[in-house]
């Protein structure tokens, strides 16, 4: 039976710009917003868009990501006609090969894709924060009779040189693609979200592999090749909130925007929920000295200090006399007595010892997973 569309989430990136936060886990597994991991947004968008089959392509440090996704039940992807598959590099008769790029990762999983037998494939990045109805994008793809549709976001002209830019005609057909141009001709930036007719893409990838023609990356190789061949390639304009959280600064900004009064992500919209693995935790405890304002405090936290405009993830502790301002404290992290944290991201399980000060006024500071800053006490 042919399935209409299969989603493939590219989640194998190392995320070196996130420094200590990705030394032991893949970037899509990094926590966000107190309760979620970054990949939850792509998975939830799939679930909310009615996509029942999802492949998650992993490579770098996949254990935490695999454990988080499990059988996909948190996103309703564990039914008879639905499922989530973890796709990792494997040894074949011709030898071992790591994924060499985004499109090469798809080529390496052709057998899996063929087993699902989709008419279309939706290619997603697992490390962006946004809400999007992929079904609406698919309808646009069909209406345009496109071979490829690229989701684009209008960005300020001064920032356009950081992105792959799509130049389009009056009907939004893409006539030129420029990778990070010094003098951009438009402000339509690729979001790294693509819908392909599967058989067309399959044929191209197989032919490129046989002829040893480099076709490892969608932005650098596949899109330019489609345009060169005269394929119908269209832009799908997206106007909602979207954030690439590939740096410490952007991850911190996205978390702060998440708790802002405006909340552009519209996280409280019950019609488009973001789902995640539900870990059962005890209620929060606020001690006699606790002072919390303008903050998001998730289940299982212990607070006996001051928390302002910050996020405390599951099981975080802020002990007596400690102050946390404009910061993200990830799960299980401990902020010791009298410690002061400002504009920082404290990784899962980290310990900030009593009296330690971390000031990110000039540059957002980061403490890695299970890292100890200062001298830990027996209580920690």
UniProtKB/Swiss-Prot annotation:
Residues reported to bind alpha-D-glucose 1-phosphate: 164, 179-180, 190
CDD domains: ADP_Glucose_PP, LbH_G1P_AT_C
Molecular function as annotated in GO: ATP binding; glucose-1-phosphate adenylyltransferase activity
Domain of life: Bacteria
Catalysed transformations (reactions): alpha-D-glucose 1-phosphate + ATP + H(+) = ADP-alpha-D-glucose + diphosphate
Keyword line: ATP-binding, Carbohydrate metabolism, Glycogen biosynthesis, Glycogen metabolism, Nucleotide-binding, Nucleotidyltransferase, Transferase
Family matches, as Gene3D superfamilies: Hexapeptide repeat proteins, Spore Coat Polysaccharide Biosynthesis Protein SpsA, Chain A
EC id: 2.7.7.27
Family statement: Belongs to the bacterial/plant glucose-1-phosphate adenylyltransferase family.
Quaternary assembly: Homotetramer.
The protein's name in its UniProt record: Glucose-1-phosphate adenylyltransferase
Organism: Streptococcus pneumoniae (strain CGSP14)
Gene: glgC
